[in-house]
Amino acid sequence: MYFEEGRLFFIKSQFNGRVLDVEDGSTEDDANIIVYTQKYEDCLNQLWRYENGYFINAKSAKVLDIRGGEMQPESQIIQYAQKMVEEAANQRWAIDEDGYIFCEARPDLVLDIQGAEDEDCVPVILYERREGEVSANQRWELVPFEG
């Protein structure tokens, strides 16, 4: 999936159209990443840019991270201060043509809407990649910000 590095975008679920958001618009380390209805104003906490493997939040300048660095299923996705590349295995991500966003160090683990819940404020977790219709809550699209 092609996108321009450094450009702001929403990370939108192919499952329910909600976007990745930082809970309560926090700018603090360890804030949970959730899905929420896309906003069109006051939306910096829903906007991201991609640089050198990091997804960086536009409001906080923190990056997508795995709580405690635990690369295992059901680990909570959070935002955290960016680490140096050699220490950032749990902060470096890629996205494939099917829309799976996966940890570069563990391509079998992807961003997942916990429990495939279809509502706001549901946590985003790391989970084993699934295929077919059951994988919709694990697939995303990067939607450029036009503001």
UniProtKB/Swiss-Prot annotation:
GO terms for biological process: depurination; negative regulation of translation; symbiont-mediated perturbation of host translation. Antibodies against the toxin protects mice from mucormycosis and thus could potentially be used to treat the disease. Its EC number is 3.2.2.22. Gene3D superfamilies: 2.80.10.50. InterPro entries: Ricin_B-like_lectins (IPR035992), Ricin_B_lectin (IPR000772). The keyword Zinc does not apply. Pfam families: Ricin_B_lectin. Keywords: Hydrolase, Protein synthesis inhibitor, Secreted, Toxin, Virulence. Disruption phenotype: RNAi-mediated knockdown decreases cytotoxicity in vitro and decreases virulence in a mouse model of infection. RNAi-mediated knockdown has no effect on the germination or cell population growth of the fungus. Induction: Repressed by hypoxic conditions. One of its GO terms (molecular function) is rRNA N-glycosylase activity. It catalyses: Endohydrolysis of the N-glycosidic bond at one specific adenosine on the 28S rRNA. Residues 4-143 form the Ricin B-type lectin domain. It is found in: Secreted. It is an enzyme of class 3 (hydrolase). One of its GO terms (cellular component) is extracellular region. N-glycosylase that inhibits protein synthesis in the host by depurinating ribosomal rRNA, and thus acts as a ribosomal inactivating protein (RIP). Promotes vascular permeability in the host and induces necrosis and apoptosis of host alveolar epithelial cells. Belongs to the ribosome-inactivating protein family. Type 1 RIP subfamily. This is Mucoricin.
